[in-house]
């Protein structure tokens, strides 16, 4: 077997070049012998990649199908072109392989059986390179990805081609999302140490081209009517939804977190459906887990958590967000720079966090301060304080922080707030960025990466592009149909 392999390699031009490089390095004279180690490393790498490319090209050619006709997904295709050279991009460099093309009987676009059987993605990427480029695109721009590939000494995809790949993969994932996510969940294990499952929902504003056009039209209309003020809120931005499902042990240590990110959509329908499905899958295995529902004070988030699915869940307002109206109330009563106000804020915050029934004590303290503010000179400040008091009263049932700590429940939505930053902000809000339909592609890739589900997800994506081809061979009036196999 080793002799056969050596014989095969010796017939390759790239193998001969590799041997020449090694032989030249051992001679005292010559350019290669005088190279620095760095230069030799580059030269050797190119030679090895050349050998790798030639071996890959030979193996890829085995997936070609030379038949009068083929059947793919139930449709018949007839051979139209033979031995057409085409270059695919691999993780080691370009592979140029001659292949056959087939066309529908009634005309139309050709298919390449070789590409279908090998799982070539986007007509040009080998599966390994497609995975590598998509992974990098989750962390950097297409231009940066192209430059990194070049820096590695490879002839990789252009910036424009790299930009198209995540969109293609995202579209495929979206069309199979529910069954694929379901299949992935069935393979996952709920840790035996888990005692709490926490579901969190939030959002972050990102620059959006459609919103920017709308904002520009609004500004121009206002200008024509002589208005000088703009509408409130960040113009040219739309909200990306983020959600997390976290498993914690009895010490509130995080065991596992699944992160989801969705492009702007009405009432976050897809995102909430993903959270529902993830929670249901976990509770189907461990129905005794305590469920926590965490969010900030946004009404939209709590409309989601008030549904019957979360009837038995403990609703928790993030402690940090609960502290914000408390800080504002102290500023309204004592003044922004008051040392006494800062001290009282610190006291009440600790009371809210650690004292059983602390929320009631804080509400009582705020009500007492509101009563003490009287007179016309305090009207505006009293109104501000009463507003914050009302916020506290409205969220009272979700602010038993001492009880949550005792039961091992999280009291903050820091996990989902971090997801907003790592899923969306770090990739979608870089300087000068503005997005159209490419947002979801980045969010899908990053959510899979950050949830440690990338490898499992890629296995599903890669398999989607590998398509079986049936060869059709005629014998008189008879036809023989056989599943195409690799050539010897």
Regions found by a protein language model. Name each.
Residues 1-58, 99-488:
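Catalytic center-proximal scaffold of phosphoryl-transfer enzymes
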Residues 58-122:
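An N-terminal low-complexity regulatory-tail signal and nearby short nucleic-acid-interaction modules
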């Amino acid at each position: 077997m080793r002799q056969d392999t050596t014989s095969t390699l010796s017939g390759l031009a790239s193998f001969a070049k590799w041997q020449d490089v090694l032989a030249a390095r051992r001679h005292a004279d010559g350019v290669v012998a005088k190279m620095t180690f760095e230069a030799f490393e580059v030269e050797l790498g190119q030679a090895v990649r050349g050998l790798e490319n030639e071996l890959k090209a030979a193996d890829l050619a085995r997936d070609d199908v030379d038949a009068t006709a083929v059947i793919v997904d139930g449709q018949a295709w007839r051979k139209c072109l033979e031995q057409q050279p085409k270059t695919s991009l691999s993780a080691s460099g370009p592979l140029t392989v001659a292949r056959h093309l087939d066309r529908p009987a009634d005309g139309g676009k050709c298919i390449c059986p070789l590409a279908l059987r090998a799982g070539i993605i986007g007509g040009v990427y080998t599966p390994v390179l497609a995975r590598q480029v998509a992974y990098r695109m989750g962390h950097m721009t297409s231009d940066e990805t192209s430059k990194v590939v070049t820096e590695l000494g490879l002839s990789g995809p252009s910036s424009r081609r790299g930009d198209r790949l995540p969109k293609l993969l995202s579209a495929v994932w979206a069309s199979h999302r529910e069954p694929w996510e379901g299949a992935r969940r069935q393979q996952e294990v709920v840790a035996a140490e888990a005692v709490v499952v926490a579901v969190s929902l939030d959002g972050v504003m990102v620059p959006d081209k459609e919103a920017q056009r709308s904002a520009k039209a609004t500004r121009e209309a206002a200008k024509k009517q002589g208005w000088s003020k703009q509408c409130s809120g960040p113009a040219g931005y739309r909200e990306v939804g983020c959600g997390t499902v976290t498993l914690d042990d009895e010490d509130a240590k995080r065991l596992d977190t699944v992160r989801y990110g969705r492009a702007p959509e009405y009432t976050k329908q897809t995102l909430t459906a993903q959270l529902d499905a993830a929670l249901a899958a976990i509770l189907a295995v461990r129905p005794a887990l305590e469920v926590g529902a965490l969010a900030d004070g946004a009404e939209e988030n709590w409309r989601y958590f008030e549904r019957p699915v979360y009837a038995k869940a403990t609703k928790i307002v993030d402690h940090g967000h609960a502290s914000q109206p408390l800080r504002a109330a102290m500023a309204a009563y004592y003044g922004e720079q008051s040392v006494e106000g800062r001290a009282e804020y610190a006291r009440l915050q600790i009371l809210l966090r650690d004292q059983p029934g602390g929320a009631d004590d804080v509400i009582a303290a705020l009500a007492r301060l509101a009563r003490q503010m009287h007179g016309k000179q305090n009207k505006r400040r009293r109104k501000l304080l009463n507003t914050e008091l009302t916020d506290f009263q409205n969220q009272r049932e979700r602010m038993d922080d001492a009880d949550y700590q005792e039961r091992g429940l999280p009291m903050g939505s820091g996990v989902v707030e971090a997801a907003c930053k790592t899923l969306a902000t770090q990739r979608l809000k870089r300087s000068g960025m503005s997005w159209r339909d490419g947002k979801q592609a980045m969010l899908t890739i990053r959510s899979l990466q950050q949830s440690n589900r990338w490898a499992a997800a890629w296995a599903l994506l890669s398999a989607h592009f590998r398509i079986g081809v049936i060869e059709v061979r005629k014998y008189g009036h008879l036809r023989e149909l056989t599943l195409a196999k690799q050539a010897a």
